[in-house]
Design a protein with these regions (language model features):
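P-loop NTPase motor core
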Residues: 1-65, 69, 79
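Conserved P-loop NTPase
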Residues: 74-122
Length: 122
């Protein structure tokens, strides 16, 4: 059977579901079914920041039922736009919550710690 599944994106999958509660119920049932099958799922979701309220998901409910959240994004540093990765949540694992600059090189992925106070538009 299938052991790994990527859904890109949860936003597209759930856009016609009329309420956050129904989205939560659907994603919980999906996660439970996949776990029963022994399938690891990676759900891709667009995130937004609306004023002081930031979400780690499209609908504001996915993060409550997920085991892990890894954020990929862009940040400006000295006039350059850099990619970053941040592990926000990972159940059963101690991890740094800091942002790391992400660079794709011919030798593979390179992660570099970002300076805590060096951010512009963080």
């Amino acid at each position: 059977g299938v052991t790994r599944l990527v859904i890109d994106s949860v936003t597209t999958l759930c856009y016609k579901i009329p309420s956050e509660q129904l989205i939560r119920d659907f994603l919980f049932k999906l996660g439970k079914a996949l776990a029963t099958l022994g399938c690891t799922a990676l759900l891709v979701s667009e995130i937004t920041s609306s004023g002081a309220k930031a979400y780690w998901s499209s609908f504001g409910v996915e993060e409550a039922i997920l085991d892990g959240i890894i954020v990929l994004g862009d940040v400006e540093r000295m006039g350059h736009l850099l990619r970053f990765v941040q592990v926000v949540k990972m159940l059963g694992s101690s991890h740094a919550r800091a942002k790391y600059a992400l660079e794709l090189t011919p030798k593979g992925v390179m992660l570099t710690p970002m300076l805590k106070w060096g951010a512009v538009n963080d």
